[in-house]
Amino acid sequence: MKISNDVLDVLSNATTSGNALSLSGQLERGLYQRANKVIEAASGKWNRKAQCHLFDGDAADAVDQIILTGEVTVKQDFGYFPTPEVIVDQLIDLAELIPGMHVLEPSAGQGAITVKALRVGARVDCVELLPENVRALTGAIASAGFNATVEMIDFLTIPPVQCYDRVIMNPPFARQADIHHVNHAMKFLKPDGILVSVMSAGVMFRTNRLTIDFKNKVDANDGEIIPLPEGSFRESGTMVNTVIVKMVTR
């Protein structure tokens, strides 16, 4: 997200101490709201008791990065929308998980799918790109009393190794990124491995070559496309229609 010059000025004039950031002076309401949006996107949260914004880490480091680049990453820029619990349960059921299976979650977010798979008794390797999500993910795993491998990297840059029994995922959708992520994820499965993924409903009706080839792949891998109810991700901040795709490697 690009940041306007007046908000950059506000951040430049702010004072920091440890994980605390205090804005200087009395800001016009609209300007404050825009500055607050940027601070929250950088993981700063208003603390009423402290009367300042508090960050998970060093506030100066977070603000300096924003000022230097003139932008801040928000989760939705990377297509991150948390998976609602009812859909997590459906994914786990479709994956036919049993204890001891080795599972890959390529867009692990903040751990909704990972923790559920760990509770089944699976061994889970997680990939996540956003630092804020990685912090939340590792915290969720630890709080649930489990261990899992977490790697902060762009999943599409990882060379595939066929070592997983299952892949369970909710990838980004923008510009048909979900197809690219699922195609790459299939390369990580052992023979007879199962992939289940939330995807955009566009895979059911779009007619471009990428979509046609993907539907052929679903058919070739004993797959199915299961429509989800409209508004399934409303609580996560999007009304995009979604499906679950299941495939079995042969």
Please describe what each predicted stretch is.
Residues 1-250:
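Class I S-adenosyl-L-methionine-dependent methyltransferase catalytic core
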